[in-house]
A protein has these predicted regions:
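Extended, charged low-complexity regulatory segments
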Residues: 1-243, 482
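Hydrophobic anchor at the beta1->P-loop junction of P-loop NTPases
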Residues: 252-254
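Walker A (P-loop) phosphate-binding loop of P-loop NTPases
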Residues: 257
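Alpha-helical nucleic-acid-binding subdomain
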Residues: 272-613, 618-627, 635, 644, ...
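Conserved lysine of the Walker
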Residues: 260-261
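Conserved helicase motor core of SF1/SF2 NTP-dependent helicases
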Residues: 281, 290-294, 298-306, 311-315, ...
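Pre-Walker A (Motif I) flank of P-loop NTPase domains
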Residues: 246-250
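Post-Walker A alpha-helix
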Residues: 264-265
């Protein structure tokens, strides 16, 4: 039983937190009374915190106290043993686990909920629900991703159905709760006209269906060093995207500051919450940079997305290749590729050239065996291979001494077993040749990659056959001949032994002699069989000599495994393309090139995912999307981006139609102040609408005044410039981004591309040499303070 609380007080607490309300006229009148509602919300918050302490913290504290006492008793005990030590380790582990579990409820103290929604229905009556980042049954808090909480974001819908219940919304309220205090609340929607008269309402209801609290919440978080959590500020239009069906593929085109990345993460969290079968390993999130991954890490933890794989596109290519045994990342040369080559690589000409070349390689090789003028020879060789296998069966079924003469003995050499004679290995080579030729002549065509790998095995087997068949068969016949001589001598020796049977002298070992004479016949038959196996080897050698001298056959034939096949394909295609531009070595872009090559050859690449999210999707070329869809053939693709933010002349998209048929659009800027949005619209003609947040005017300043601009400012700071001008900002207090993320104390110095998707309280843009799109991106990284730096 709960200690320190009277039953009556506990009952009152549960009644307060219960969503079930007796909604009489007095209740509805109280909804219109601001002071009464503040008192109610404060009492409710107090009740939540009390219940939190009673049901959770007290329980954990008691457990921890007991465990600590037990641990202390063990420490103080006499004759401390190894068993006591193990028990103490277990106690400490349990203490740590209980403390961690107790820490999981910290979020309920910080911000237990952010909204309240009152609804009525004919079956359950009036219920008041509180919506939070995490749900809890005892605290009567509904998780924001739950079906009922979803309706909070659908501002224009006041009536809705869930399962068999038909609900009508009475109240939709935004709440600002922080560290156990109610800071403020605002009614987004309040409809009491069904119960109260116009005189009683007196204009105090709220029928306006938009989010009046959005501006104030964002404004209050504008200078927060940590990432802004906009769970409680999601607009209906945004949430329409968040709760699209799981298998729907779409593009979200949004202007700068419209919350595209937040929508991506919230959608993923929403889908995983509502589908228990959707596991983190089923989802891939492609982001623009490692700095961006670090930037969104805090929100990912809030939304419980830590286990979802978040990588750059280059890292995904590396992971795919690593699964193929190719560690490309370790071989990068560090040089910059020729822009002309990149323009070719990310254009549609590159995959077209790959397709043509791979098809040519495949066709040429396949034709050596299956073309009309070659087919008759191939069929004869295949027939010979099958005939040899029948003969080989007879050899294997021969008596022990004959088998050993031909096949040798099986011995153990530590790492495994081996045969003392090469006959079996030769016949295994003939089996591989037979399998390959049978596939080429009789089975449906498969992928080029499958054929290439089969060809490697055939080439290796054929090389062995050509180099050793004549010798092995001849040696086998010689060994059989030697065995025959031995058997004949044995017969002569056995015939020397005689005994009398009556008046007649008979052979003592007549049965042994008979068996050996039978063995001689078997030896002769097997020798003739091997002689027939030798027939046709010359024709096989002729075919192989033609194959060896044909085009790329020798190069492919030297391959040992699938990795070597990939290298051979690379040399025949990508490497030769790079030579045209005078490029040597391995570049980051080779990850895409090699993945595209292997996919074109038909190799089944992994890892594969069921859901693929792409942020800053305008920077990914059409051919890359085609590759991603080929690798992840069953995946739904959700692409988030802004066509106006594409800054790579050789990569990216001009239209979303090449990616997906369905496109949603957002044009309201939630990130920047009116002054910044107005400046950007004037400078680059951007199509976006501000939400009315006011801040400082945009300033222009000399290079020497950059440091002064940031002095005394709070929040994240950044200088954004073209790469060739970054050295201008190599000074004390400035820093380049690292793998650990952005600096919260120094001024971050970034290129335009590195800044994509990020946001800073104060930004100075050195826009010399920037394109319109680059300026658009750089200017809109500023939350509230923007300076344009001029001069040198």
């Amino acid at each position: 039983m709960i200690k320190g609380m009277e039953k009556g007080a506990l009952k009152k607490l549960r009644k307060l937190l219960s969503p079930k309300k007796k909604a009489d006229k007095e209740w509805y009148l109280s909804l219109l009374d601001g002071q009464a509602q503040r008192a109610y919300e404060e009492e409710h918050l107090k009740g939540v915190l009390s219940m939190l302490k009673v049901f959770y913290l007290s329980r954990y504290r008691r457990k921890i106290a007991v465990l600590k006492a037990e641990a202390e008793e063990i420490r103080r005990g006499e004759n401390y043993t190894a068993a006591d030590y193990r028990t103490l380790i277990e106690k400490n582990a349990r203490i740590a686990a209980e403390e961690k579990a107790m820490g999981g409820y910290k979020c309920f103290f910080t911000e237990p909920y952010f909204a309240r929604m009152d609804v009525t229905d004919e079956k359950e009556g009036y219920n008041s629900y509180y919506i939070g980042k995490k749900g809890d049954v005892n605290l009567e808090i509904v998780d924001w991703r739950a079906p009922l909480a979803v309706r909070y974001y659908q501002k224009s819908r006041v009536e809705f159905s869930i399962n068999e219940y038909d609900y009508r919304t009475v109240l939709r309220r935004a709440l600002a709760v922080k560290n156990g205090k109610l800071l403020d609340f605002k009614n987004e929607y309040l409809s009491v006209r069904d119960v109260l008269s116009e005189e009683e309402i007196a204009g105090r209801d709220e029928e306006i269906l938009f989010d009046p609290y959005l501006r104030s919440i964002i404004q209050s978080r504008k200078d927060d060093v940590s990432i802004r959590d906009i769970i409680q500020t999601i607009q209906e239009k945004q949430f329409e995207v968040i709760n699209r069906p799981e298998r729907e593929s779409f593009v979200l085109q949004g202007c700068a500051g419209s919350g595209k990345t937040m929508i991506l993460l919230h959608r993923l969290s929403y889908l995983m919450y509502n589908n228990e079968n959707l596991r983190p390993r089923d989802v891939l999130v492609i982001t623009p940079s490692d700095s961006f991954n670090a930037f969104i890490d805090e929100l990912s933890q809030v939304l419980e997305l830590q286990k979802v794989r978040t990588v750059t596109l280059a890292e995904y290519y590396y992971a795919v290749l690593k699964n193929e045994g190719i560690d490309l990342k370790e071989k990068l040369c560090g040089e910059r590729p020729d822009p002309a080559y990149l323009a070719y690589l990310y254009s549609e000409r590159f995959p077209a050239d790959l397709k043509k070349k791979v098809s040519s390689l495949y066709g040429d090789l396949y034709g050596l065996f299956a073309a009309a003028e070659c087919r008759e020879v191939t069929e004869k060789i295949l027939s010979d291979c099958r005939r040899r296998q029948e003969s080989y069966k007879r050899v294997k079924n021969a008596s022990l001494r004959v088998r050993r003469a031909v096949l040798g003995e099986m011995k153990d050499k530590g790492e495994g077993y081996y045969f003392t004679k090469p006959f079996r290995a030769l016949m295994s080579a003939f089996t591989q040749a037979e399998d390959f030729l049978g596939f080429v002549l009789n089975e449906p065509e498969r992928t080029p990659d499958y054929f290439f790998r089969l060809f490697v095995e055939f080439y290796r087997a054929a090389k062995q056959i050509v180099s050793s068949a004549e010798t092995v068969f001849t040696r086998a016949q010689e060994d059989l001949s030697a065995l025959g001589e031995t058997v004949r001598r044995e017969i002569v020796d056995l015939k020397r032994y005689r005994r009398k049977q009556g008046e007649e002298e008979i052979l003592t070992y007549a049965d042994r002699i008979a068996r050996r004479e039978e063995l001689l016949g078997e030896i002769g038959a097997v020798s003739e069989e091997i002689g027939r196996m030798k027939e046709g080897c010359d024709l096989f050698s002729e075919l192989f000599s033609v194959v060896r001298m044909s085009g790329a056959c020798a190069g492919l034939g030297r391959c040992a495994d699938s990795v070597d096949v990939a290298r051979w394909l690379y040399r025949e295609t990508v490497q030769s393309y790079k030579r045209r531009y005078g490029m040597k070595g391995i570049y980051e872009c080779d990850g895409y090139a090699l993945c595209a090559l292997l996919a074109e050859a038909g190799r089944r690449l992994t890892p594969r995912y069921g859901l693929v999210f792409v942020d800053e999707g305008q920077d990914v070329s059409k051919s890359e999307y085609d590759l991603l869809k080929k690798i992840n053939g069953d995946a739904a693709f959700n692409v988030f981006g802004d066509l106006d933010q594409n800054v790579t002349p050789w990569r990216g998209l001009k239209s979303w139609e090449t990616v997906c048929d369905k496109t949603y659009r957002l044009d309201r800027n939630y990130r920047n102040t009116n002054e910044i949005v107005g400046f950007v619209k004037k400078e680059v003609g951007a199509d976006m609408t501000p939400i009315g947040l006011h801040g400082e005017e945009v300033v222009r300043l000399r290079l020497s005044g950059t440091t002064s601009f940031f002095r005394g400012g709070q929040g994240l700071k950044a200088v954004i410039a073209k790469e060739e001008y970054l050295p201008l900002f190599e000074k004390r207090g400035y820093c380049r981004p690292t793998s650990g993320g952005l600096s919260k104390t120094k001024i971050n110095v970034l290129t335009v591309y590195e800044s994509k998707g990020l946001e800073f309280t104060s930004v100075a843009v050195y826009d010399r040499g920037m394109t319109e799109n680059e300026k658009y991106i750089a200017y809109t990284r500023a939350l509230s303070r923007l300076a344009v730096v001029e001069g040198t």
